[in-house]
Regions:
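Residue-level detector of beta-strand face positions
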Residues: 23, 114-116, 123, 136
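Conserved beta-strand hairpin/beta-sheet module of binuclear metal-dependent hydrolase folds
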Residues: 1-51, 135-152
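Metallo-beta-lactamase
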Residues: 30, 37-39, 121, 132-208, ...
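Hydrophobic/aromatic beta-strand patches that form the interior of the parallel beta-sheet core
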Residues: 9, 64, 91, 107, ...
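Active-site-proximal loop/helix segment associated with metal-binding centers of metalloenzymes
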Residues: 18, 94-95, 101-110, 135, ...
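Active-site HxH/HxHxD metal-binding segment of metal-dependent hydrolases
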Residues: 39-114, 215
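Histidine-centered catalytic micro-motifs
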Residues: 63-73, 127-132, 192-197
Length: 219
C-alpha cells in the first residue's frame, strides 16, 4: 500500500495492464475505488482492500469505479467486494446498469453525486471523454481522472466509432469540470490517473481542463 495524498492510498496495480485499486479514507470510513478483475498469479483487489481496511480499522462505506472498461470493472470483483464488505454501498454511474449483473442495492447516478466519508465530501462527476461511463472522483482536493487523456480532447479510441465519445460531449465534460470549483466552492489542486501513472501537484485545475478541451496532437 502506497500513500499518495492524505487519505488516498494506492493498494496495488492489478489485472493485465496494471489498473490501480485505491483506498480513500477519512476518520474511520473508507471507499474502495476501482473494481478490476483479478488475474491468475497477480494481486487480488478484494484481498488488497480487505487487508488495508483491517490494518487501518476502517469501515468500507462505498465501492466506486471510474468507468466500465474491462480492465477497470469486473462483475466477479464487484460481487466479491460486496460479500467482503456487506455494509458497503456500490455507487456507479447510470451507464453501469447494463454491465452490473445484480443491481439490487446499487446506487446509480446520472450527472453528479455528493457522498460523505467521515465528514469529508466525496464527489462523483459523470464526465465522458475516454469512455461513456467516465466518472471523475474528487476527494480531499484531489481528482482521479480515470483514463482521461489530459491536455487534449483527443482519445486513444478515436479510431473506433463504437468506443469513441462524440467530440462535443468531451468538450462539454471539460467545461463541466471547469465549472466545478466555482459551483461547489471547492479547490481541486491535485490530479492522478487511476493506473497510477500520472500524479500532479499544485494544479490549476480549470486551466488544465481548458487545455484538455483543445484539439492537440500529443501522440
Amino acid at each position: 500500500m502506497e500513500t499518495w495524498f492524505e487519505g488516498i492510498a494506492l493498494l496495488g496495480r492489478v489485472a493485465w495492464v496494471g489498473t490501480g485499486c485505491w483506498l480513500l479514507a477519512n476518520d474511520d470510513e473508507a471507499a474502495v475505488l476501482e473494481l478490476p478483475p483479478s488475474v491468475w498469479g497477480g494481486p487480488d483487489p478484494v484481498r488488497l482492500a480487505a487487508a488495508a481496511a483491517t490494518e487501518r480499522q476502517l469501515r468500507v462505506k462505498y465501492l466506486l469505479c471510474t468507468h466500465a472498461h474491462l480492465d477497470h470493472f469486473s462483475r466477479p470483483t464487484l460481487r466479491r467486494m460486496r460479500a467482503t464488505f456487506p455494509d458497503a454501498e456500490a455507487v456507479l454511474q447510470a451507464g453501469f446498469r447494463g454491465v452490473v449483473d445484480d443491481p439490487l442495492g446499487v446506487r446509480f447516478f446520472d450527472r453528479c453525486e455528493a457522498l460523505d466519508l467521515g465528514g469529508e465530501p466525496l464527489f462523483l462527476v459523470h464526465a465522458p471523454k475516454h469512455s461513456r461511463t467516465d466518472t471523475l472522483v474528487i476527494f480531499r482536493g484531489a481528482v482521479c481522472t480515470g483514463d482521461w487523456e489530459l491536455e487534449t480532447r483527443r482519445t486513444v479510441h478515436d479510431w473506433n466509432p463504437l468506443w469513441r465519445v462524440p467530440v462535443e460531449t468531451r468538450v462539454e465534460s471539460c467545461e463541466r469540470m471547469m465549472r466545478f470549483q466555482r459551483e461547489r466552492n471547492y479547490d481541486v489542486h491535485r490530479v492522478y490517473s487511476v493506473h497510477g501513472t500520472e500524479r500532479r501537484e499544485n494544479v490549476d485545475f480549470p486551466a488544465l481542463m481548458a487545455q484538455t478541451r483543445e484539439d492537440r496532437q500529443l501522440w
